Amino acid sequence: MMRCGLLGEKLGHSYSPAIHAELADYAYKLYEVAPDALAAFLTGGDFDALNVTIPYKKAVIPYCAELSPIAQKLGSVNVLVRRPDGTLYGDNADAFGFEYLVRHSGVDISGKKALVLGNGGASATVQAVLAQLGARVTVISRSGEDNYTNLGRH
């Protein structure tokens, strides 16, 4: 049976085990790991695949033998797979999910302006996908030239 789970620091709010129990026949556990224990967990952890959440989406990268092109571009990993040789492969599924939603929305965004509200972790993924699909991307954040006080000019 595959051993899967969610890696993060504080996971008490997660519904992931219940969701995955409905999806398939594999073990899915929450792995709450302190930052100072991350290296030992990744190199010796008893898992086959993990979803990765804050604060480890960037921190796991040095432990990956290989990254998918999108994970490399974004500098963010939210899926880890332990290969048969024991090495870790890092990927970012958020980009695929967001691209799927955009493509299936029925709206062609190529050549159109897209406003991204916020510049946190998910923002980089959204920006990359929108740009890849041909949109002109503007990021609105709390500070900087394009911010919430002048949103109306967009």
Language-model features: locations:
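Glycine-rich adenosine-cofactor-binding loop
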Residues: 8, 90-95, 102, 106-107, ...
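Phosphate/diphosphate ligand-binding glycine-rich loop within oxidoreductases
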Residues: 2-105
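Rossmann-like adenosine-cofactor binding region
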Residues: 146-154
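Short acidic/polar active-site loop segments enriched in Thr and Asp
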Residues: 48, 135-136
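Short, charged helix-to-loop "capping" segments that act as catalytic/coupling loops
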Residues: 45, 143-146
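Residues that mark the start of a beta-strand
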Residues: 1-3, 112-113
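Short, hydrophobic beta-strand segments that form beta-sheet elements in well-ordered domains
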Residues: 6-7, 31, 136-142, 154
